[in-house]
């Protein structure tokens, strides 16, 4: 039996990954992390979506220690989430240092327990928002280290790594989940489901990607299939 673990926030990217995993694996588990995030409404959204999309199990892990260690606008109410700035330089204040290091490591430990062959994460280098822990070289390096540390061959899969947001919408549509992803996921840094607040960087990327896909469906779908190898 093929098993996978999805790092699952209930947002656009991880929900698209879950929709795909349900077609590619016999059994899919979801792991969601409670780190005291500003947008912690995503935890309830993730619970609902994991059930709706047929996950075999859904674990919510308490990692609130990360909130104490990592200073970010997503972990401190006193630090405002900035509006989207198209030409902003540097790492944004929404970056949570160590988040993906912790999430992927814990997901791999869970995968070891349930005998899963893969950990799936929705990180993306094309639209990575300046986050260093969304880069392909980071994921591959951590995967190598985790496998050495556990003497186990668990793959870190990144199905969205080389596609952009419009193509991610196309992928959701390919698996028949465009409306669900649009209406029921939570991507917004301010914790608003669906189309979100419309001002933060996460909402901007999501909206621009959706608009581009809806305006150029055939071309974007073709590009997505070419990059992912889907038919």
From Swiss-Prot:
This is 7-cyano-7-deazaguanine synthase. Pathway: Purine metabolism; 7-cyano-7-deazaguanine biosynthesis. Keywords: ATP-binding, Ligase, Metal-binding, Nucleotide-binding, Queuosine biosynthesis, Zinc. Belongs to the QueC family. GO terms for biological process: queuosine biosynthetic process. It is an enzyme of class 6 (ligase). Catalyzes the ATP-dependent conversion of 7-carboxy-7-deazaguanine (CDG) to 7-cyano-7-deazaguanine (preQ(0)). Its cofactor is Zn(2+). Its EC number is 6.3.4.20. CDD domains: QueC-like. HAMAP family: QueC. ATP binds at residues 8-18. It comes from Salmonella newport (strain SL254). GO terms for molecular function: ATP binding; ligase activity, forming carbon-nitrogen bonds; zinc ion binding. Transmembrane segments: none annotated. InterPro entries: QueC, Rossmann-like_a/b/a_fold. Zn(2+) binds at residues 188, 197, 200, 203.
């Amino acid at each position: 039996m093929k098993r996978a673990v999805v790092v699952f926030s209930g947002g656009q990217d991880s929900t698209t990954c879950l929709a795909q995993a349900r077609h590619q694996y016999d059994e899919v588990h979801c792991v969601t992390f409670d780190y005291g995030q500003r947008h912690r409404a995503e935890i309830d959204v993730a619970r609902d979506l994991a059930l709706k999309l047929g996950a075999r199990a859904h674990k919510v892990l308490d990692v609130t220690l990360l909130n104490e260690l990592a200073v970010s606008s997503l972990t401190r109410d006193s630090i405002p989430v900035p509006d989207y700035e198209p030409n902003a330089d540097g790492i944004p204040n929404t970056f949570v240092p160590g988040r993906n290091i912790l999430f992927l490591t814990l997901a791999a430990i869970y995968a070891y327990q349930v005998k899963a062959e893969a950990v799936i994460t929705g990180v993306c280098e094309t639209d990575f928002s300046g986050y260093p822990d969304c880069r392909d070289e980071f994921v591959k390096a951590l995967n190598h280290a985790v496998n050495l540390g556990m003497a186990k061959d668990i793959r870190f899969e990144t199905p969205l790594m080389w596609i952009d947001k419009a193509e991610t919408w196309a992928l959701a549509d390919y698996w028949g989940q465009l409306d669900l992803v649009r209406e029921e996921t939570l991507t917004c840094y301010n914790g608003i489901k669906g189309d979100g607040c419309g001002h933060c960087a996460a909402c901007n990327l999501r909206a621009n990607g959706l608009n581009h896909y809806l305006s150029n469906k055939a071309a974007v779908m073709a590009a997505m299939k070419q990059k992912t190898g889907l038919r």
